[in-house]
């Protein structure tokens, strides 16, 4: 499983090649902290909603700290998605490295 740091994601976005940011956290977590433009599909809904994800698209999966998103990234790879990364450190790392306005929780 590949990982991408928040800084690498930001660099790709700045270069005009932003991957899809897939937020797999629960609704209550989004109420605390969210990243604009992220697509939200809760972890438990991923199998039923695979059709919403393009297999050819670059997808970066995020959760709070990187554990759940790593599981989803592995699952997507098993389903044939080859352009998938786990966001290293999750939204906590995003807050620390890119956007301190996002509260850690």
Regions found by a protein language model. Name each.
Residues 62:
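Short, surface-exposed ligand- or partner-binding patches at beta-edge/loop junctions that are enriched
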Residues 1-20, 27-58, 67-105:
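Rhodanese-like catalytic fold shared by cysteine-dependent sulfurtransferases
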